[in-house]
Amino acid sequence: MSSPQRRKAMPWALSLLLMGFQLLVTYAWCSEEEMGGNNKIVQDPMFLATVEFALNTFNVQSKEEHAYRLLRVLSSWREDSMDRKWRGKMVFSMNLQLRQTVCRKFEDDIDNCPFQESLELNNVRQGISFPQVHSCGCCMGCGVGTGAADKAIPRDKGK
């Protein structure tokens, strides 16, 4: 015979166990180029728009004077949301390699702006958490859950 407290704890224990399995999934640390371009996600127009949104958000929130530009997509994957509200919607996750440019953040043509020349690489590594956005894009730019770009960690410093 189990106590009422044990019965209440069982659903929580089960949900923690199920969420723990999601953490066991690991992704290869190789770029899309090294994977032979087999990943079709990087060609998806919605993924490209999401990358552009993430890069723009990073530049807007960054305290740096100069803009960052995409160097390459290190890895990417599409996730299925467990949340009932977002079920069936597109959720992209990605690891991007960014590099600082000579252009200021709000100049018109950042896409064609050259990278800064320096002996020290200025790539950054950052964990940024965007709200789960579905394909219509209606939640893009709402700012909920976005990480602060000023907390970016210089990737190559201290090595």
From Swiss-Prot:
Recite the UniProt keywords alphabetically: Antimicrobial, Protease inhibitor, Secreted, Signal, Thiol protease inhibitor
User: Which Gene Ontology CC terms are recorded?
Assistant: extracellular space
Q: Which InterPro entries match?
A: CST9-like, Cystatin_sf
From the Swiss-Prot or TrEMBL record, state where the protein is found.
Secreted
Note the Pfam families from the entry.
Cathelicidins
Q: Name one GO molecular function term.
A: cysteine-type endopeptidase inhibitor activity
Biological process (GO) annotations held by this record are: antimicrobial humoral response
Tissue expression pattern: Expressed in heart, placenta, lung, liver, skeletal muscle and pancreas. Not expressed in brain. Expressed in epididymis, kidney, testis, spinal cord, and thymus with a strong expression in epididymis and kidney and a weak expression in the spinal cord and thymus.
Q: Which residues form the signal peptide?
A: 1-28
Output the superkingdom of the source species: Eukaryota
Please give the function described in this protein's UniProt entry: May be involved in testis development. May play a role in hematopoietic differentiation or inflammation. Has immunomodulatory and antimicrobial functions against Francisella tularensis, a Gram-negative bacteria.
Instruction: Tell me which family the UniProt entry assigns to this protein.
Output: Belongs to the cystatin family.
Q: What is this protein called?
A: Cystatin-9
Q: Which gene encodes it?
A: CST9
